[in-house]
Swiss-Prot record:
Highest taxon, organism lineage: Eukaryota
Site (Hydrophobic barrier that decreases the speed of ligand binding and dissociation) location in chain: L229
TM region positions: 81-97, 112-137, 147-171, 192-215, 233-258, 323-348, 357-382
Comment on protein domains: The PDZ domain-binding motif is involved in the interaction with PATJ, CASK, APBA1, DLG1 and DLG4.
Extracellular side: 1-80, 138-146, 216-232, 349-356
Pfam family, one: 7tm_1
Cytoplasmic side: 98-111, 172-191, 259-322, 383-471
Binding-site residues for serotonin, renumbered to this chain: D155, N343
Protein name: 5-hydroxytryptamine receptor 2A
Motif range (NPxxY motif): 376-380
Chain span(s) of sequence motif DRY motif: 172-174
Organism: Rattus norvegicus
Keyword Electron transport set for record: no
Length: 471
């Protein structure tokens, strides 16, 4: 059936999904120019019975017809953005649950990652759905004008908080590598939460001018009906303060951390090789009178000793953690750099650049940046066994780890065995001390007998005494 985009047209065969557009684009408007309606170059539409629109437009296309032409494209955009929103919210909720419930994950770095997950989750709840709504309305602001400044404020706040968290993680790990004793002494849970509060305070301070000035002057947050930052000075300064400066600090400290870990690994290997050369030593144990032989015992310390393994293991764990964080840093930089670079280009080459092209690039790049909030939980799942196990249990609604029977047996029996072994060691120590005291008494008695025999034997009688060794 053919449908003409005119005022007096009968639209009986249009699907309900096209008729119920609400306040969005309609098939016709009252202000449609009559001369355009009377023109012979009308646009023909063919709609089949399966609610699938076959568009065959001929001649002049009024704006209302163009809006329907782009309807299918908007549906695909809405579908993709919905997938990103669901992944962002669900994945970051799993991260928050894992750090809150798993004791293995409760350390300073994972507290930062949990706070980062909170920022990403709020971005998915409060910012992304509104951004998807603007796409469906042709990047026009469909909500009350006062909410525009609030929405931009939340967008800048959570995006800035993400980069600030990554910068703080990089700095914290660098300090931990450089001063491990000082860091371990003062790196309590309270200190970690104070650092997180400082990160959020900085993020709020950077983004606060947006609602302060945007609510007073709509021209700073509106441009041609679209909700976006229109103040070039704030765009330029905010991009450097909220992204490029923290990015520089994060990259420098990360590479310094990698360099320090490599240096420590080299020193540890050389130290182990030095210990291997001085691997043997001997000592003389105590002996009783019944056994006067001297025993020698040699203990050989190999490079794989417990102390060496512990040092190498700690360095290996740090390297693995830096690898995972490096992937998170890299993905964040790759996904947000195009947006901020294009944002600065829009200010610098405002006259020479094509505004339509710049605007289209910004609309695409901002969603690529949003995608970074969804990929972090995937990175944790791929590269961290504890996160992977926790996520798998949470999806199955199992919030506590189920221990196997063998683990329960070991948990119940090992403390008793340890107690018995400690009691045995204490008994052995007491017995050895009693033997040593008895040995000393025997030695003193022998010495006293020797002295008395020497006093009584004044004649030319030679007395042969046994040599007694008490070591």
């Amino acid at each position: 059936m053919e449908i003409l985009c005119e005022d007096n047209i009968s639209l009986s065969s249009i699907p309900n999904s096209l008729m119920q557009l609400g306040d969005g684009p309609r098939l016709y408007h009252n202000d449609f120019n009559s001369r355009d309606a009377n023109t012979s170059e009308a646009s023909n539409w063919t709609i089949d019975a399966e609610n699938r629109t076959n568009l065959s437009c001929e001649g002049y296309l009024p704006p209302t017809c163009l809006s329907i032409l782009h309807l299918q494209e908007k549906n695909w955009s809405a579908l993709l953005t919905t997938v990103v929103i669901i992944l962002t919210i669900a994945g970051n909720i799993l991260v928050i649950m894992a750090v809150s419930l798993e004791k293995k994950l409760q350390n300073a770095t994972n507290y930062f990652l949990m706070s980062l997950a909170i920022a990403d989750m709020l971005l998915g709840f409060l910012v992304m759905p509104v951004s998807m709504l603007t796409i469906l309305y042709g990047y026009r602001w469909p909500l009350p004008s006062k909410l525009c400044a609030i929405w931009i404020y939340l967008d800048v706040l959570f995006s800035t908080a993400s980069i600030m968290h990554l910068c703080a993680i990089s700095l914290d790990r660098y300090v931990a590598i450089q001063n491990p004793i000082h860091h371990s002494r003062f790196n309590s849970r309270t200190k970690a939460f104070l650092k997180i509060i400082a990160v959020w305070t900085i993020s709020v301070g950077i983004s606060m001018p947006i609602p302060v000035f945007g609510l007073q002057d709509d021209s700073k947050v509106f441009k041609e009906g679209s909700c976006l930052l229109a103040d070039d000075n704030f765009v330029l300064i905010g991009s450097f303060v909220a992204f490029f400066i923290p990015l520089t600090i994060m990259v420098i400290t990360y590479f310094l951390t990698i360099k320090s870990l490599q240096k420590e690994a080299t020193l540890c290997v050389s130290d182990l090789s030095t210990r291997a050369k001085l691997a043997s030593f001997s000592f003389l144990p105590q002996s009783s009178l019944s056994s006067e032989k001297l025993f020698q015992r040699s203990i050989h310390r190999e490079p794989g000793s417990y102390a060496g393994r512990r040092t190498m293991q700690s360095i290996s764990n740090e390297q693995k953690a830096c690898k995972v964080l490096g992937i998170v840093f890299f993905l964040f930089v790759v996904m947000w750099c195009p947006f901020f670079i294009t944002n600065i280009m829009a200010v610098i080459c405002k006259e020479s650049c094509n505004e339509n092209v710049i605007g289209a690039l910004l609309n695409v790049f901002v969603w690529i940046g949003y995608l970074s909030s969804a990929v972090n939980p995937l990175v944790y799942t791929l590269f961290n066994k504890t996160y992977r196990s926790a996520f798998s249990r949470y999806i199955q609604c199992q919030y506590k780890e189920n221990r196997k029977p063998l683990q329960l047996i070991l948990v119940n029996t090992i403390p008793a065995l340890a107690y018995k072994s400690s009691q045995l060691q204490v008994g052995q120590k007491k017995n050895s001390q009693e033997d040593a005291e008895q040995t000393v008494d025997d030695c003193s008695m022998v010495t006293l007998g020797k002295q008395q025999s020497e006093e009584n034997c004044t004649d030319n009688i030679e007395t042969v005494n046994e040599k007694v060794s008490c070591v």
